[in-house]
Amino acid sequence: MASIIFTAKDIFDQDFKREVRGYSKSEVDEFLDDIIKDYETYAALVKELREENRRLKEELAAKPVEKAPVQPTQPVQSTQATQSTVESFSQMTSATNFDILKRLNRLEKEVFGKQILDRE
């Protein structure tokens, strides 16, 4: 985080060298007056926010930790429907696995059976 280089007082007390073809002194003064006002506003805002931050931290530290009650995600009535769905899915999976094993066995017989015949 960048630090603030000038305070409102530093800007107010700054003197510029005067030259023949220099800037308009009144214009520079008006501009610097606006900058000073901005700095004062920023300083007040930072002070206010720091105070609010401190107050909120104190409130948070003083507040006891509350745990939210755990609620079931599904109603009890739908649990039986879910169990029957799981059972039917596992039956489909085992049937699918059995079909895959049969196909694999048949392919192995074709591939390795030919290799055994070729060796003889």
UniProtKB/Swiss-Prot annotation:
Low complexity bias: start-end ranges: 68-86
Positions of the UniProt region annotated as Disordered: 63-88
Keyword terms: Cell cycle, Cell division, Cell shape, Coiled coil, Cytoplasm
Record carries keyword Transmembrane helix: no
Localization in the cell: Cytoplasm
Pfam families: DivIVA
Gene Ontology biological-process annotations: cell division; regulation of cell shape
Coiled-coil annotated spans: 32-68
Quaternary data: Forms polymers through the coiled coil domains. Interacts with PBP1, MreC and EzrA.
Listed NCBIfam families: DivI1A_domain (TIGR03544), PRK14127.1 (NF010725)
Protein's name according to its UniProt entry: Cell cycle protein GpsB
Organism: Streptococcus sanguinis (strain SK36)
Gene from which this protein is expressed: gpsB
